[in-house]
Amino acid sequence: MKCELCGGELDAVTLRCTGCGAKYTRVCVHCGAAMEAGEKACPRCGGEGLPGLDMTRQELTRAGIKCFMPYAGDRVYDIYFGGNHDGGGWEFHNERGYVREPPESRVVLPALVEGRPIYGIWNEFFCVGDEFVPGRQEEAYARMMQIRQIVVSNGVREAFTYSFFNCAGLETLELPRSMVSMKYDFYDLFMDGQEPMGNGVKKSPVTIRYRGTEEDWRKVAVTSRFWDYVAKGCIKMEYLGR
């Protein structure tokens, strides 16, 4: 497997990238559990383990990526990509989870933070609706148009309804075989067939590069609108195989 950050080879034993030194930890593609070094099958469910990008908190900060753990009462939930003014509970006031300025054209989302698996991508991770009020739209679109490619590492399991909200310049989205639910339906990008900023320019298709087979993808929960957009050519599927 190639490093998702630099394209270098991973050391077969340590799972460190031989190019940039990035750390990878084996993650079960079926249940999302982190696995010990040397384990090829998940001891919990028997699922296949694949290397997932494992960042430190400092590395996440440098990359402009926020994570948080929602909580309600005495229950603490999994780790998600995203931000929340309230920190948790049933009340959520989203704030941007990707805060790098200026944004990178290619954003890589890891699967773990210091060995702890990241479950999914929360709503409005890249931008929030408040950024598109009159007077702020031009600035928001200028930032979002810079993000052309998003790569999600092996182990992440879910993308929420507004996880890629208004990623206006998105051209390629690479998703792992561990994905079980893709709730984002691209409606905000293709509702009129034009680029979201209403400039009359036709929106180019988004290519989803899926690290699995077409049969695998058919098991992922998606919306009915998703397949409508595939049929219309707004979304192009590319199956990379196992």
Describe these PLM feature segments.
Residues 2, 16, 27, 41:
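The −1 position to Zn-ligating cysteines in a subset of zinc-ribbon hairpins
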Residues 7, 32:
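Detector for the canonical C2H2 zinc-finger "Cys2" submotif
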Residues 13, 24, 38:
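Short metal-coordination and nucleic-acid-contact micro-motifs, chiefly zinc-binding Cys/His arrays
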Residues 21-29, 45-53:
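Short Cys/His-rich micro-motifs in 6-15 aa windows
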Residues 52-100:
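Short beta-strand/loop segment at the start of cytosolic alpha/beta domains
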Residues 62, 68, 74, 101-119, ...:
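Structural signature of tandem-repeat unit edges
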Residues 124, 160-163, 185-188:
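Consensus positions within tandem repeat domains that build extended binding/scaffold surfaces
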